[in-house]
Swiss-Prot record:
Name of the protein: Transcription factor bHLH53
Main location: nucleus
A Pfam family assignment: HLH
CDD domains assigned: bHLH_AtbHLH_like
GO terms under cellular component: nucleus
InterPro entries membership: bHLH95_bHLH (IPR045239), bHLH_dom (IPR011598), HLH_DNA-bd_sf (IPR036638), IND-like (IPR045843)
Subcellular compartments: Nucleus
GO term, biological process aspect, one: regulation of DNA-templated transcription
GO molecular function annotations of the record: DNA-binding transcription factor activity; protein dimerization activity; transcription cis-regulatory region binding
Encoding gene, per UniProt annotation: BHLH53
């Protein structure tokens, strides 16, 4: 049993004295099945005296432990099977100038102060239970406030760097905007203008204007001569109101004229004096008769 106790404390790297291995302030509870024998001391008194014949010999050592002990060290007792009748209060095992005794490893103890030591050369990392490590403090820093509004494009700072437009550029933009608006309106007036691009629409607009001028002249001539029945006038008005017929006539660069009026034009002296006009009128009449 003494070898077991010594081998436990000699696992440390530095040499440890047995008196340093004693644990003061340890709450020990000795079970009824264990017994301990110590050297007699005047100040220690037990309720039951040790018998002289059961006292351990001071010259008895374990052969294995002899090499670790000096003659000045304490002697470890040999325990017997003697049983104490009652549990003794061992609080009187406090640090004293006298050497202390080691007890059997089968005792029970309170683990709260298990590694406390009064020896200043023995470092106990778990003894000082009142030590509280200081919490790590970090320097406080303030996070800048960011705007939650998301702006697409240039920000407020970019507005100051935006180049200013000259008066000529502003006027040119205004002209282009007005041209685009007028072109859109013109496309609504020309028959089939929504199917044309800008260049084709301008050409169709020029032809449509010529068609309107010619058609208006024929209608005025019909009113002055007052030739033709009312049915012809109504039929002519009905045809000219159609957008499809206007688109067809303007594309072919012709106008609508009643057949009776064409026949009357052949008898006019002014037309007969102009061979080109007379020739065109004869072609129209020949086509009409062929149909």
């Amino acid at each position: 049993m003494s070898m077991d106790c010594l081998s436990y404390f000699f696992n440390y790297d530095p040499p440890v004295q047995l008196q340093d291995c004693f644990i003061p302030e340890m709450d020990m509870i000795i079970p009824e099945t264990d017994s301990f024998f110590f050297q007699s001391q005047p100040q220690l008194e037990f309720h039951q005296p040790l018998f002289q014949e059961e006292a351990p010999s001071q010259t008895h050592f374990d052969p294995f432990c002899d090499q670790f002990l000096s003659p000045q060290e304490i002697f470890l007792p040999n325990p017997k099977n003697e049983i104490f009748n009652e549990t003794h209060d061992l609080d009187f095992f406090l640090p004293t100038p006298k050497r202390q005794r080691l007890v059997n490893s089968s005792y029970n103890c309170n683990t709260q102060n298990h590694f406390q030591s009064r020896n200043p050369n023995f470092f106990d990392p778990f003894g000082d239970t009142d030590f509280v490590p200081e919490s790590c403090t970090f320097q406080e820093f303030r996070v800048p406030d960011f705007s939650l509004a998301f702006k697409v494009g240039r920000g407020d700072q970019d507005d100051s760097k935006k180049p200013t437009l000259s008066s000529q550029s502003i006027a040119a933009r205004g002209r282009r905007r007005r041209i685009a608006e007028k072109t859109h309106e013109l496309g609504k007036l020309i028959p089939g203008g929504n199917k044309l691009n800008t260049a084709e629409m301008f050409q169709a607009a020029a032809k449509y204007v010529k068609f309107l001028q010619s058609q208006v002249g024929i209608l005025q001539l019909m009113q002055t001569t007052k030739k033709g029945s009312s049915n012809v006038q109504m039929e002519t008005q009905y045809l000219l109101e159609s957008q499809a017929i206007q688109e067809k006539l303007s594309t072919e660069e012709v106008c609508l004229v009643p057949c009776e009026m064409v026949q009357d034009l052949t008898t006019e002296e002014t037309i007969c004096r102009t061979p080109n006009i007379s020739r065109e009128i004869n072609k129209l009449l020949s086509k009409h008769l062929a149909n």
